[in-house]
Regions:
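Positively charged, low-complexity terminal tracts
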Residues: 1-62
Length: 62
């Protein structure tokens, strides 16, 4: 099964960006400049992470 990776249409072709794929109900996340490292999560956990990022929960990491 070939994985269909997607990235934002706002990303530049040469830019480093996140790519997402859906496989068997899970979400895969990787960086385009390091495609060998893949994070597997669930849609629910990804939504919770994105909401936390939007709400500033991780601002102290940057």
């Amino acid at each position: 099964v070939e994985i269909q990776w997607r990235k934002s249409s706002f990303s530049e072709q040469s830019g480093n960006c996140l790519e997402l794929a859906v496989v068997g109900g899970d979400v895969l996340v990787r960086e385009s400049d390091d495609p060998g490292v893949v994070i597997r999560t669930t849609p629910e956990k990804l939504r919770a992470f994105l909401a936390g990022a939007r709400d500033g929960e991780f601002d102290d990491f940057a």
